[in-house]
Design a protein with these regions (language model features):
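Membrane-interface helix-loop-helix regions
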Residues: 73, 79-131, 162-166, 235-237, ...
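Alpha-helical transmembrane segments of multi-pass integral membrane proteins
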Residues: 209-326
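Transmembrane alpha-helical segments and their boundary/interface "anchor" motifs
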Residues: 38-41, 45, 58-93, 105-108, ...
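Interfacial loop-to-helix transition and helix-capping segments at the boundaries
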Residues: 6, 30-41, 120-131, 167-185, ...
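Functionally critical transmembrane alpha-helices in membrane proteins and complexes, commonly lining
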Residues: 4-58, 79-82, 113, 182-183, ...
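Membrane-proximal cytoplasmic C-terminal regulatory module of class A 7TM GPCRs
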Residues: 273-276, 327-353
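Aromatic-anchored segments of alpha-helical transmembrane domains
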Residues: 17-24, 92, 113-115, 158-168, ...
Length: 353
């Protein structure tokens, strides 16, 4: 038995819209790119850390232990099929002389280290999946074997990484060492979700708009911070801690996630949980995987707006129902219940970049 956490697929839908709009601005309309795409990716990161940590907490509570083997099998069934299908399609297109992907991109894409290589457009988005995959390789072990140090580890990451962004002048923004704190903020909000939920519910409802307003300020951060001069120390401090993928952005996303789940009697909640938003959220991983190809100049008329957007959704739907869904069904075989207990309703929404 599974329980769908409300609003999260709606948030995923908003995230993928932000990424698509950013790419439409840049690749199709040749306009100055907004920061919406970066914030969209950070929403994916925060939600991913939040859900993975909740799942680990639920499994530990239910079974008094966590099966790392089952965890990695579930993650592999979720992430790998569509990811490697994309690379297989790229391989075919390269052999047809449609794409020209360098060896470095192939190597880093196949090994989930894409953020180490500044390559071509078509595999450029896979950096975020590399970040997430490395999170999967670290956090579950910390959670299982360093139980008393979980919170210390999480706080250490989210304190250190903003200073990495600062002292590198954010010169590698698509990197585990500059973006990993977004996922860890999701973990922290999961670890503290009960007291934070009580805190939110105890506050006047009109205050719930505050993280949304602050996130809009982060979205406009480049223009706002421009007044202090792009080369000034203050500018880099502001970008590292309050920019479009800075600390303030991640905190706002964390609170927005909890607000979106718990404040149910308003238009915003109903909007996030409409059938359309739910289904787009379900498709968001496939949309993210395939959208890069349809913004590529190498595929000719197929990349023309708005036809490319239609193609993205068509391919994502086919990909989800023919590839993702069959593997997702297999995941249920690796969710164990204690035989002496009734099945607990576990939130098993899949995580995406």
């Amino acid at each position: 038995m599974t329980q769908i956490i409300p609003s999260l697929n709606g948030l995923r839908a908003l995230s993928i819209f932000a990424v698509l709009i950013s790419h439409i601005q840049d690749r199709s309309l040749h306009l100055q790119t907004s920061s919406g795409g970066q914030i969209g990716v950070n929403i994916f990161f925060v939600i991913s850390g939040f859900l993975i940590t909740l799942l680990l907490m639920k499994e530990e509570e239910r079974n008094r232990s966590i099966s790392l083997k089952d965890f990695f099998i579930r993650r592999s069934l979720r992430i790998f099929p569509v990811y490697f299908l994309l690379l297989f399609v790229y391989f075919i297109l390269q052999n047809l002389s449609i794409l020209d992907i360098p060896a470095g991109s192939w190597l880093t894409s196949l090994t989930y280290t894409r953020y180490f290589f500044d390559g071509e457009w078509e595999t450029g988005h896979l950096w975020s999946l590399s970040v997430e995959e490395h999170f999967y390789l670290i956090w579950p072990f910390v959670f299982v074997y360093l139980k008393r140090k979980r919170i210390t580890f999480a706080w250490s990451i989210i304190i250190i990484i903003p200073f990495v962004r600062l002292f590198t002048n954010i010169s590698f923004m698509h990197h585990m060492f500059s973006r990993g704190d977004a996922i860890m903020w999701g973990c922290v909000f999961a670890l503290y979700h009960q007291p934070l939920t009580r805190f939110i519910k105890a506050k006047p409802s009109y205050l719930m708009v505050l993280p949304f307003l602050l996130l809009l300020c982060c979205l406009a951060s480049k223009k706002i911070f421009h007044v202090v001069g792009n080369d000034s120390t203050l500018y880099h401090v502001l970008q590292a801690f309050a920019g479009s993928y800075g600390t303030l952005t991640n905190i706002c996303i964390g609170f927005i996630t909890l607000i979106s789940i718990n404040y149910k009697h308003n238009l915003y909640y109903r909007f996030l949980n409409t059938t359309l938003m739910h289904h787009i959220g379900v498709l968001s991983y496939s949309i993210y995987i395939w959208q890069q190809l349809f913004f590529s100049e190498h595929i000719g008329p197929l990349s023309t707006f708005p036809y490319n957007i239609i193609l993205i959704f068509v391919v994502a739907i086919i990909s989800y129902y023919l590839v993702e869904q069959p593997f997702l069904r297999l995941k249920n075989h690796f969710i164990k219940q204690k035989p002496s207990e009734e099945p607990t309703a576990v939130p098993v929404l899949s995580t995406t970049p």
